[in-house]
């Protein structure tokens, strides 16, 4: 039998142990309910890298940076450039950092935009036989798109379009810009613009897809819009447009032709970049469902057929990166180039073998059929870019300007027939 004293000892032992447990439990409970520390956040991939292979050659690919400072005139690759017989390439302007878009004013001023590196708008002015480079706007957000019309310079950023009135009278003291349109999404991916006033007097502006490949709101992205010059009357002219950074209107038909850069990371050799032709307002050119007029997207193309969309007028190479384009309407070049398109191919960054980085001529017959041939080449050497054409401009004298954002330079192509 257990005696009373033994019983009391057992009871007090149980009480003591219970009390200890009750005293320790809040600390244990506190430890177990404290959430674990969050792991360090990983940096998000840049938009261009989403979908990039995780191994192999593709994993090493990234956009090719331009030179961090403009190339001095005596180091520019003029001697490397090849053009057809009778043509000549010369330096028009050097040390124009990040030179992209080109426009000419009524008095001959050449306006130059920039993109990632500079955030500036330049004016090139002839002064006593020398070409002076003036900065007329700076600290802008990706001001790639520019247009000149009736004395005013229009500038497009991802967020808005502004206008600098009477700019050629005020190059030394530029006026405050007037905002005419601020209904742009503002996304950085494919948010940089190319703008042009059409034969209808309206301003055309693209809104690219905010991604490599996705299914964005079709009423907001992947389109070309047009507006009145006061910003009113917005209308969507073309849909299914991933990223156009160049367009122009046929001198005879008035039809809109535009470049389009196709999606990345499907393969090195597909899809092929496009030149497209708008024959009816509201046409759909396929993105993100169909690429190159013949390739259904493996992610978004289920249930779609490329026959549902407008086929490209011309395919111009895988990842060739077509940028600026102009119909030639000058009088200097041979007759074969009249009404032909001069188009810059910036060259791919996501191909192991670099190519393009050139200017091509595109010839269009009366039925809209198009063919392409080289015009200015020679800027790929040892699988490296030594120059990258970005835009073209037909000057009033009929010569052709070519901007090179890689070197921060502008070249002039002339024809003498000799």
What would you call each of these model-derived segments?
Residues 109-113, 152-155, 202-206, 255-259, ...:
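Conserved beta-propeller blade signature
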Residues 95, 105, 149, 198, ...:
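Structural WD40 beta-propeller signal
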Residues 35-84, 192, 209-212, 227-232, ...:
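Beta-propeller domain segments
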Residues 142, 159-198, 206:
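Asp-box/WD-like beta-propeller blade repeats and closely related beta-sheet repeat scaffolds
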Residues 98, 117, 132, 139-142, ...:
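Beta-rich catalytic cores
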Residues 393-418:
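Blade-level signature of beta-propeller repeat domains, shared across WD40, Kelch, NHL, RCC1
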Residues 102, 146, 195, 244-247, ...:
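Hydrophobic core register within WD40 beta-propeller blades
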Residues 92-96, 135-139, 180-187, 236-240, ...:
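Surface loop/turn motifs at the tips and blade-to-blade linkers of beta-strand repeat domains
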């Amino acid at each position: 039998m257990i005696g009373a004293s033994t019983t009391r000892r057992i009871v007090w032992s149980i009480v003591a142990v219970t009390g200890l447990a009750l005293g320790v439990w809040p600390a244990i409970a506190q430890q177990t309910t404290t959430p674990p520390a969050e792991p360090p956040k990983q940096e998000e991939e840049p938009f261009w890298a989403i979908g990039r292979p995780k191994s192999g050659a593709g994993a090493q690919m990234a956009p090719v940076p331009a030179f961090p400072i403009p190339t001095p005139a005596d180091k520019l690759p003029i001697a490397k450039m090849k053009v057809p017989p009778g043509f000549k390439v010369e330096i028009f302007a050097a040390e124009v950092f990040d030179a992209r878009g080109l426009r000419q004013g009524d008095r001959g001023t050449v306006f130059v935009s920039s993109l990632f590196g500079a955030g500036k708008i330049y004016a090139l002015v002839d002064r006593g036989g020398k070409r002076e480079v003036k900065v007329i706007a700076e600290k802008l957000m990706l001001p790639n798109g520019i247009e000149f019309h009736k004395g005013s310079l229009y500038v497009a950023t991802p967020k808005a379009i502004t206008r600098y009135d009477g700019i050629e009278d005020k190059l030394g003291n530029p006026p405050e810009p007037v905002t005419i349109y601020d209904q742009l999404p503002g996304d950085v991916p494919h948010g940089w613009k190319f703008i042009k006033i059409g034969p209808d007097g309206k301003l055309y502006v693209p809104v690219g897809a905010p991604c490599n490949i996705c299914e964005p709101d079709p009423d907001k992205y992947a389109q070309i819009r047009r507006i009145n010059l006061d910003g009113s009357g917005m209308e969507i002219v073309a849909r299914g447009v991933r990223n156009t950074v160049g367009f122009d209107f046929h001198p005879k038909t008035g039809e809109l032709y535009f470049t389009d850069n196709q999606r990345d990371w499907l393969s090195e050799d597909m899809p092929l970049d496009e030149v497209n032709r708008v024959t009816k307002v509201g046409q759909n050119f396929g993105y993100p469902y169909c690429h190159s007029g013949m390739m259904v997207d493996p992610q978004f193309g289920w249930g779609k057929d490329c026959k549902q969309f407008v086929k490209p007028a011309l395919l111009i190479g895988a990842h060739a990166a077509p940028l600026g384009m102009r119909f030639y309407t000058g009088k200097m070049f041979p007759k074969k180039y009249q009404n032909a398109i001069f188009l810059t191919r910036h060259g791919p960054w996501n191909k192991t073998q670099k190519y393009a980085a050139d200017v091509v001529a595109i010839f269009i017959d009366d039925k809209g059929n198009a063919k392409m041939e080289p015009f200015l080449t020679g800027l790929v050497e040892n699988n490296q870019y030594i120059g990258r054409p970005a835009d073209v401009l037909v000057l009033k004298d009929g010569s052709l300007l070519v901007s090179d954002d890689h070197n921060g330079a502008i070249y002039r192509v002339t024809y003498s027939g000799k």
